[in-house]
């Protein structure tokens, strides 16, 4: 019998409050804030710019450069949260590791998970070299000349180049011949989160599709940690950024089982409690590990309409030590609403038309500034099957017009 104490939740803004600090207050962080507040948690949201989506709904908000360890330590010591939840990758994770080692704070899922996954080198070496999981062939290089040598030395064409520290497709491109190398190298150097630096070059896998397998480590009623899986999420990307997702994505039983085994291995090693977005390539019954995010995943926004508990509720419950329910309610899809204009304080037209069809919903993120390819919202839909849901979600997002 487990001796783990049952979670006790306090009252916000009182001496009994359970305080959670989110590092990153974008659209995903905003939904986590809402999920936590529904459970009576006092939430502090931190981001690098004012009036971020999560700032608008948190009990308190701070504007901090989260890559500055001194500034980050100061806000953590000021607020004294019980739990720190990294919601983005651009964080001084060395500090989180040190604070967790000191016993000063608990990081969800773990400080080590946040540290390893902020850098493609850390998580790729863990997956491929420590855990022995199947991945694309890869090399890490620091110069354009080393990139050429890696390609000629076995990676071959076509191949994919990415900064070791970037997100949302920034700095990522496909190299199809030697003529592409110089431009791809420059683009990768411009797209890194911390400026120019190291890149990963990967051999191209001829996959049929890619999925996100949302994997949840949570405590059951007996206090034991159990790993549970959501139904696989299919998605389409343009320039490395997701434009639509759907759930469930059809898979062979063998591929689904192998996907779960890979996800179990990597999340089990990272440890802790919470949701992980495990990205996988699939060809027939073969599965390759790609990446993992120890937090809700952008493609998982479909779960806002498709699941009994969406990915944000799952993360909130898990990090608080509560049981979760990963069941699918109905096939669903999400479709991104882009800004389309460069402006502050935009207005949204066509919302009534977007919501006129039964089984639809939208989320407008409330970002203070729009630009052409910035994700400003998402259209959501459910239907009898994913094809119908995708078509319906696309109609929702297309109906919404952004006006400066």
UniProtKB/Swiss-Prot annotation:
GO terms for cellular component: cytosol. PANTHER family: FORMATE-DEPENDENT PHOSPHORIBOSYLGLYCINAMIDE FORMYLTRANSFERASE. Its EC number is 6.3.1.21. Involved in the de novo purine biosynthesis. Catalyzes the transfer of formate to 5-phospho-ribosyl-glycinamide (GAR), producing 5-phospho-ribosyl-N-formylglycinamide (FGAR). Formate is provided by PurU via hydrolysis of 10-formyl-tetrahydrofolate. Signal peptide: none annotated. Homodimer. It catalyses: N(1)-(5-phospho-beta-D-ribosyl)glycinamide + formate + ATP = N(2)-formyl-N(1)-(5-phospho-beta-D-ribosyl)glycinamide + ADP + phosphate + H(+). The keyword Ligase applies. GO terms for biological process: 'de novo' IMP biosynthetic process. It comes from Bordetella pertussis (strain Tohama I / ATCC BAA-589 / NCTC 13251). One of its GO terms (molecular function) is phosphoribosylglycinamide formyltransferase 2 activity. Mg(2+) binds at residues 279, 291. Keywords: ATP-binding, Ligase, Magnesium, Metal-binding, Nucleotide-binding, Purine biosynthesis. Belongs to the PurK/PurT family. This is Formate-dependent phosphoribosylglycinamide formyltransferase. Pfam families: ATP-grasp, PurT_C, RS_preATP-grasp-like.
